């Protein structure tokens, strides 16, 4: 083989090799990555945050943000502003509910002010938080996979009256 033919042959092999590499990269990007993305990510869920305080407790209680967007599988912290409006120290306890109900088994409260009674001094203001995790399986369950918006509600009650079943 003469030198010119060897050069053309090497050039041809390099072009074939680069073409195959580009083709494999294209297949990887357009097939493997798209399929992988559709299985590992999910659409965010909107949480509408509602609060109320039973008339037996003279507190103000509001979410810092009334609506937040969360991604299933990510730990989320939600903050609430609370204030004792009375001139005496008072204790309250919160109950937690959500709608739609079938979503509840997919919410894990990792830390919550609602686990214990909370006491505020007269006119004291504070920030309470809840740390929660929405199980990514929520996007795969037939009863919940189409839910894109959830309402979470906390109601604060006077702790003593709540404990004594007087509410």
Task: Set out the residue ranges of the language-model regions.
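Buried hydrophobic-core signal for structured, non-transmembrane domains
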Residues: 79-82, 130, 152-154
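Terminal connector regions
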Residues: 89-106, 110-113, 136-167
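Beta-sheet-dominated interaction scaffolds and their linkers
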Residues: 46-79
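Mid-length scaffold segments of soluble, non-membrane domains
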Residues: 66-106
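Membrane engagement elements in two modes
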Residues: 1-58
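Short coil/turn motifs at beta-sheet boundaries
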Residues: 40-42, 71-73, 123, 145-147
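Intrinsically disordered, low-complexity Pro/Gly/Ser/Thr-rich segments with frequent PxxP/GP/PP motifs
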Residues: 68-69, 73-74, 85, 111-138
């Amino acid at each position: 083989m003469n030198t010119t033919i060897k050069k053309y042959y090497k050039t041809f092999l390099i072009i074939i090799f680069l073409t195959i590499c580009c083709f494999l990269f294209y297949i990887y990007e357009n097939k493997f990555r798209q399929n992988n993305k559709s299985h590992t990510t999910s659409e965010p869920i909107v949480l509408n945050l509602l609060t109320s305080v039973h008339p037996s407790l003279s507190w103000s209680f509001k979410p810092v943000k009334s609506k937040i967007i969360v991604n299933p599988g990510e730990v989320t912290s939600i903050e609430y502003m609370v204030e004792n409006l009375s001139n005496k120290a008072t204790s309250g306890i919160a109950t937690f509910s959500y709608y739609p109900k079938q979503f509840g088994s997919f919410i894990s409260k990792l830390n919550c002010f609602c686990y214990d009674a909370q006491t505020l001094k007269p006119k004291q203001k504070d920030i309470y938080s809840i740390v929660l995790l929405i199980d990514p399986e929520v996007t795969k369950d037939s009863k919940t996979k189409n839910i894109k918006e959830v309402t979470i509600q906390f109601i604060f009650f006077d702790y003593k009256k709540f404990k004594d079943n007087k509410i």
